[in-house]
Amino acid sequence: ADIVKWNYTTSRTGTDTYWLGMESSACAYDHYIYVCDNSGDLMCIDINTMELIWSQDIVDDSNASPVLEVDPATGTAYIYVSTSLHWTANKKKSGDIPIFKINAATGEIMWKRTYECKTVDGISGGVQATACLVENNLSGLVYFNIARTGGKKHGKLVAIDKKTGGEVWSVDLKYYSWSSPVAVYTSNGDGYIILCDSDGNMHLLDGKTGVVKDTINLGKNIEATPAVFNNTIVVGTRGKKIYGITLK
């Protein structure tokens, strides 16, 4: 097979101090891929023709991969995505980051909500982790992990209603996190969220209420997203260790 390159230009360029390029994974649906870049673009590309179908301004640099879900009632695909706080930070290194629900066919913004964040030189705040889509008793929610909100060291996990964009619950975290939230389920379908943070904590939360059910500390910053198989969680830390943890 031949290697195909797709080139593009935007109104934001390196001369405006924006960095061009992509640091997150694409998501795909049918014969389209959806990808974010460092200059605040979310783009839909037809992979059969390599043509740009649409581009949506999502305001800032996105390090989080977009996630896509098809509404079973309508058959319409939607994308959930957010950004870091980078180019849009003010002189005090603070600002609002957006969370979007976007129509995958048209690029239309269905809803948008914002959260105030902090950033420091070289280490931006905002959403650095991919959102978590869920099922069973958690259906109707999407989870975002927000770094450096409520203070430079703090964070927040939020559960958002997918239809309205309203916040269902939020949990303030003493330490910010870059790890993506992961959903796990009991045999009867009750959902829980696992979230790791920059102080080495692994939290287990009730996905319906946000109540923290348990926390263990693994010693060092956890930037990786845990992998879960049956009742075993596996995750690596900045302490050069890989842990296996049993869910009970």
Predicted features, each with a name:
Residues 218-248:
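Blade-level signature of beta-propeller repeat domains, shared across WD40, Kelch, NHL, RCC1
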Residues 41, 84-90, 148-152, 200-201, ...:
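Short glycine/acidic-enriched loop and turn motifs that connect beta-strands
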Residues 32-35, 78-82, 141-145, 190-195, ...:
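Conserved beta-propeller blade signature
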Residues 1, 46-50, 103-106, 161-164, ...:
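Short loop/turn segments that connect beta-strands within beta-propeller blades
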Residues 20, 39, 94-96, 153-154, ...:
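A detector of repeated loop/turn-to-beta-strand junctions in beta-rich toroidal repeat architectures
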Residues 28-29, 39, 74, 85, ...:
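Acidic/polar residues in short coil/turn loops that connect beta-strands
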Residues 2-29, 54-73, 82-87, 93-96, ...:
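Extracytoplasmic beta-rich repeat domains
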